[in-house]
Amino acid sequence: ESEQKQYIKLNAPIILEKGNEVEFKFGINDGYYEFSPVFRPISSTAQSVKYSVMTDGKIPFDGADNLTAQVWFVDDGKPGKLSTGDETAPTQRQSDEDMESFAYDKTGINGDFYRLKFNTGIHTVKIKCQDEPFKITALLLKRVKETEKYSDVEKNYNGTEKYNGAPIIVEGESPVLRNDYSLTAKADNSDIKVTPNDSKHSVINYIGGENWAKPYQEIVWETQVPKDGLY
């Protein structure tokens, strides 16, 4: 879906302990908005933070009093190597950056992120810590619009050249972020098509599998694009 993000920033970061709350006041245009605190967990072992939300002094929907924001993780170094020559997955640690995690239905029944409805004007959103403390710096609102048809989007590609260079391969086992600690890189040497591959040793060469099967689990990769064009 196309999007328009709006960050409502605090004058200074605030640490919310359990039961503490902070209120954001802002002007906004009419529409539906996905929302997320911009946060950092205080505990280095936290895998999520729990909070509730109120809009204009009211609970906006069932479940708004029990929301979860997922913590983002990065690899802490490169894969290790045993004395046998087999590789082990790198350990993970929390990202050093402020985190965003749009509110969602933990049951997975609702396939979209939760949304708040605002009319044009001034509104308030109150976020309350429900468990372990976290630092909050802003409220992120992302306006959701109707998704464009690909045929309409493609019309804007007229005259744009297709990329005809060497294939760009992004290895699955090397993401820059994931929002679930269980999404670790793994080894599978049963298929020679998987890269890298070693017939004698176990090497880290993929990510996901059975661990990547829950709604809203996310993995982010990064790659260098050599030139403008269609890929």
What is the meaning of each model-derived region?
Residues E1-Y231:
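Extracytoplasmic
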